[in-house]
Structures are given as C-alpha cells and as structure tokens.
C-alpha cells in the first residue's frame, strides 16, 4: 500500500486558509473594550497623528518647490557650465560677466515647468490607487493604515536622498501613491459614533491642517537665512525637512501597528463573508452581476450626463479645480511674488508658513457645521467667494508689502476654502443620486475632479516657460479667479440645494427629488 497522501485541491487550501483567518478575526472581535470611550479617544489620537503626517507629507513638496527647483535644476546646470554662483532665497546671481541673469531666469522657469509635468503625470497614481484601495476590504484597515503611513516615510526618504531630477520623480510618484488612499479617513468614519461622525471628522481634519505649522518649525530649524548651508553653494538643506518628517511617519506607522485595533465594521463584514458557504457566495455574486446594469463606472457616466443636477455639479467641480496648481504652488507665489514683488527672503516666506495653517484650520473646522446650518449650495457659494476675495487680497498684499502674518492668514483662507469646497461638492453629488448607483456616481464625480486637476497641472507646466517668474502669479490669478467665479455662477443658476436629502432613497428615484417633494409638503 502507498503511504502517499492526496494533494489538497485549491478549494481545500482556500477553506483551510479562510478558517484560520476566521478564527483570528473572531478572536480580535472578542477582545473586550472595557473603557470604550478611552479606546475611542486614543484611536482618534493615533489617527490624528497619521492625518497630520499625511497633510505635511502632501504639502512638503509644494512648500519647498522653490528650493527643490534650485537644487535639482539650477545648481546642477550652473555647476555643469562651470559657473560659481551664490544663491539667495529667490535669485541666482552669476559672478562671471559672461552669463546674464536672464539665462538663470530661463533655467528656473524651465525647471518649474518640468516639475509641473511631473505633477501632471503623477495623477496616474489616482487610477492605480482606485484598485489598490479596494484591497483594504480583504486584508483589513489596520494593515493598510500601517503600510500607507510607512510608504509615506519611505517616499520621503527618496526625496531626502535625491540630488537630481530623476530622484525627485521617483519620490513624488511614490508619495502620491501612498497619500491618495486616505485610509485614516475610512478608519475615522468606521470608528466614530454615527451621531457625531461628521463633527469628529471635521475636528480631526482641522487638527491635521493645523499640523502644517510643523513645516514652519522645520524651516526654522533647517533652513538658513540665505537658503544655503554654511558651506557656500550647498543647495540641499531642504532635504533634512523630508528626513525629519520621514522619521516621524515611520514612528507613527509602528505605533499604529502596535496599538491600533481593526475596525468593527471591517471585522463584521469580513467575518460574515468568511462564514458564507460557496453556494451563498455564488448567489451573491450572481446578484451583483445582475445589478451591474444599474451600477458600474460606464453606467454612472451615462447617468451623470442624463441627470442635469449631477452633471452641473460635476462641471462646477472641474471648473473650480482649474485653480489647483495656483493654490498648491504657493511656494513659488510667495518667492516670486506678484509682478516681481515678493518675499525675497527665507525669514519672510517661513513666517508666512507659520500663519497659514491657523486660518486653514478655522475654515476646515467651520465648514461642516455651516453646511448643516445654511445648506450645501450656499456653503459652496460662500467658499468660492472667499477663495476669490482672499487670493486677490493675498496678491495685493505681496505687491504692496503687507505684513507676513496677513499674507499667511490670507493664504490659509484660500487653501482652506478651496479644499473645503471640494468636500462640499462631493457631498452634493452623492446627495443628488439614487442609492443603488451612489458609489458609482461618486467615481464619476472624481473623474471630473481629476480632469480639472490635470488641466491645472498642465497650466502650471506651461505657464513658467511663457510668463517667467515675474508674471507667473499673474497667470495663476487670471486662471483661478475666473474659474471660481464661473463655478459659482453654475451653482447659483443650475444646481439645487441638497440639504435634507434622504440617502436611503428608493432605487431609481433621484434623491434630490425627495428633497423637493419634502419642501413642497
């Protein structure tokens, strides 16, 4: 007789693997929460730390764009051509009379255009992230919370080690990939009590925006008065900011791995799935396949173009996002100023980065409560109007030399209002469609958001070569203000209020119609 055992089939191996996973998840679920409020508080503390790291990591390449451009584009070019240069915060002067300042100006503008092209191309990570993000439904929120935060740290280390443009490209693509999923947001919504969910989220997000003050602190610690190290010609001090944030991100990632617990929402959903028989799973799959005619990305796009309410919200979003580069390239705006009148020193630009997180955080804290009070549409109109007024005042302040703290608060007002407006428009799109295709319509809305963002990056790639640094901010102003005004006009004329929408609207019925019927009664 043969003692050989019959190899296990794929299905048998899968069942054994799933049985082990089920045992592990049920054990995790059974862990007691004796002091639930304390557990919730410390989880929100960890998530707030991760949110701060996410915001700082996302903003750091924008906040240091001027220094990065000088380091990876202008300085290598000058060295290659044998010129001895001394750099200040925003100008590079040749000691040789054989080269003109215009040549350096052209190199600076060319470098900014190349960085803009990288940012445009990096939007491909948004598409990849859509598939990557869905893996958290199988592997768990905690695992990807750790992986994404650690990935941010590793991406920032790439920036730290990069001394050329190729290194910058790799670092930016990696960073964009890991900051896009926003796993901490999913965690917050699944852990927070339903009654206080929006309040808790807006509060944590406001704290995260306030955490941008750390950029100011790091600039104070690592950047000297003239933008160089004590060794003349070393343009790479900005890299230490990336290292500091990378270390903080790595520490917080392991804190989350050790102390965070898996969300109950994921545990309940995954355990229920693992307990299903193969027949039950097959029936559910067949039901989902049958419903693809209602949902799915293509169906959502068709619905978007047929439903005027959703279509105009999406159009207003795409138009408003043409300002994206103008808002996020604030380092260049502060450095080169408006019509040549700018900061012109590290101290001034650094002081501005101290003040803007405060006004940005105030807007972030407030908009959720205001939206529930006066309505989504009115809130979006207020935010778009605020963006327009704050940016015009910011540029006037740069030109006329207003105090740094005023410039900083105006900059924070622009950034906070613009970011908040995106959240409000997203909410309006979700509240304007029936339940059975809401998730798909949100993907459609994200597509319009991405179109506006890509066009904005394309503008930022072309503008420096055409306008140069002197008129760069004028181009940003001429793009942003009309985009906000046009978006505001579309909202006022074409879009209905969505406050009070029943998100459990029956299949096939427009949620916005339920609001109208309720108001009529």
What is each stretch, according to the model?
Residues 61-63, 307-361:
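Extracytoplasmic gate region of multi-pass secondary transporters
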Residues 150-163, 386-400:
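C-terminal ends and interior cores of transmembrane alpha-helices
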Residues 1-64, 84-88:
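Cytosolic juxtamembrane N-terminal segment immediately preceding the first transmembrane helix
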Residues 179, 196-224, 248-249, 445-457:
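Glycine-rich segments within core transmembrane alpha-helices of 12-TM secondary carriers
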Residues 166-179, 404-420:
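Hydrophobic core of transmembrane alpha-helices in multi-pass small-molecule transporters
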Residues 128-163, 374:
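Conserved MFS/SLC helix-loop-helix module at the cytosolic interface between two early adjacent transmembrane helices
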Residues 65-126:
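Extracellular/periplasmic helix-loop-helix junction of adjacent transmembrane segments
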Residues 116-134, 354-366:
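Central cavity-lining transmembrane alpha-helices of secondary-active solute carriers
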């Amino acid at each position: 007789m043969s003692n050989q055992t019959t190899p296990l089939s794929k299905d048998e191996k899968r069942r054994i693997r799933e049985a082990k996973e089920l045992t592990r998840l049920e054990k995790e679920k059974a862990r007691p929460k004796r002091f639930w409020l304390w557990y919730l508080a410390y989880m929100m503390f960890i998530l707030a730390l991760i949110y701060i790291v996410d915001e700082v990591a996302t903003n750091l390449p924008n906040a240091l764009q001027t220094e990065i451009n000088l380091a990876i584009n202008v300085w290598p070019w000058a060295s290659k051509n044998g010129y001895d240069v001394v750099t200040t915060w925003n100008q590079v002067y040749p000691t040789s009379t054989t080269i003109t300042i215009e040549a350096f100006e052209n190199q600076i503008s060319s470098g900014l255009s190349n960085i803009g092209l990288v940012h445009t191309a990096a939007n491909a990570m948004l598409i990849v992230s859509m598939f990557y993000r869905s893996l958290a439904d199988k592997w768990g929120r905690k695992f990807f919370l750790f992986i994404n935060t650690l990935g941010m740290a590793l991406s920032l280390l790439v920036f730290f080690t990069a001394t050329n443009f190729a290194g910058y490209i790799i670092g930016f693509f990696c960073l964009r990939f890991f900051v896009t999923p926003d796993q901490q947001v999913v965690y917050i919504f699944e852990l927070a009590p339903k009654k206080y969910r929006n309040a808790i989220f807006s509060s944590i997000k406001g704290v995260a925006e306030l955490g941008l003050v750390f950029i100011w602190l790091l600039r104070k610690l690592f950047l000297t008065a003239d933008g160089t190290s004590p060794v003349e010609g070393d343009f790479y001090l900005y890299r230490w900011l990336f290292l500091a944030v990378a270390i903080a991100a790595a520490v917080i990632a392991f804190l989350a791995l050790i102390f965070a617990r898996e969300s109950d929402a994921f545990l309940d959903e995954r355990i229920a799935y693992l307990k299903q028989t193969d027949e039950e799973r097959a029936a559910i799959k067949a039901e989902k396949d049958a419903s693809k005619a209602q949902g799915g990305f293509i169906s959502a796009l068709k619905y978007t173009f047929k439903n005027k309410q959703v279509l105009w919200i999406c159009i207003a979003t795409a138009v408003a996002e043409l300002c994206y580069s103008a808002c996020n390239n604030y380092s260049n705006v502060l450095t080169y100023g408006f019509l040549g009148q700018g900061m012109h020193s590290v101290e001034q630009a650094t002081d501005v980065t101290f003040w803007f997180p405060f006004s940005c955080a105030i807007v972030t804290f407030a908009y959720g409560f205001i939206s529930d009070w006066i309505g989504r549409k009115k809130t979006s109109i207020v935010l778009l109007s605020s963006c327009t007024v704050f940016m015009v005042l910011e540029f006037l302040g740069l030109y006329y030399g207003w105090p740094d703290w005023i410039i900083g608060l105006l900059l924070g007002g622009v950034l906070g209002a613009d970011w908040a407006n995106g959240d409000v428009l997203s909410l309006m799109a979700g509240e304007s469609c029936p339940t059975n295709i809401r998730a798909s319509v949100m993907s459609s809305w994200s597509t319009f958001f991405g179109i506006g963002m890509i066009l904005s990056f394309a503008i930022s790639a072309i503008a420096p070569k055409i306008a140069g640094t002197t008129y760069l901010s004028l181009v940003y102003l001429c793009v942003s203000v009309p985009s906000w005004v046009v978006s505001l006009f579309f909202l006022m004329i074409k879009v209905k209020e969505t406050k009070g929408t029943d998100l459990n609207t029956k299949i096939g019925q427009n949620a916005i119609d339920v609001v109208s019927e309720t108001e009529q009664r």
